[in-house]
């Protein structure tokens, strides 16, 4: 069985979403098969950005409405990086918000962030054997 994981992220503006994810993490836009949907590749995953209006309903049977200010969700991306400070700098320059940095020299440091659309993600520094940064 062959499996592929695709991560789908709602954004209020497709062009801004593509700009952020390509600049922050090096994704490349592969297709825009229909209006309001962009397919990006990078980091060994396929990322689909879906343009969805703020205030629209995310599914039938819920009173929830889409909102793009910072929000909590039980699902987020962990992006493992060799150089945390460089990756964090690129993400912030592209529009990410750094919320907290957790320094752990023995196991790898991490930065808790959100994208410009309120979705949380973590940057986690890879460590080599012996505890040194990768």
What do the predicted segments below correspond to?
Residues 17, 21-22, 91, 118:
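Conserved active-site tyrosine of GNAT-family acetyltransferases
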Residues 120-123:
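Short glycine-/small-residue motifs
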Residues 1-8, 28-79, 88-114, 125-134:
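Vicinal oxygen chelate
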């Amino acid at each position: 069985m062959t499996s592929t994981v695709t991560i789908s992220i709602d954004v209020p503006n497709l062009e801004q979403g593509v700009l952020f994810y390509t600049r922050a993490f090096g994704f490349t836009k592969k297709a825009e098969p229909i209006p309001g949907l962009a397919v990006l590749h990078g980091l060994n995953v396929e990322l689909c950005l879906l343009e969805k209006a703020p205030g629209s309903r995310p599914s039938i049977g819920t009173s929830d409405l889409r909102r793009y200010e910072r929000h909590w969700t039980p699902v987020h991306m962990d992006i493992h990086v060799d150089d945390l400070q460089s990756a964090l700098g690129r993400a912030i320059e592209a529009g990410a918000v750094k919320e907290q940095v957790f320094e752990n020299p023995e196991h790898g440091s991490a930065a808790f962030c959100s994208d410009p659309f309120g979705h949380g993600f973590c940057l986690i520094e890879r460590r080599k054997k012996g505890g040194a940064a990768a």
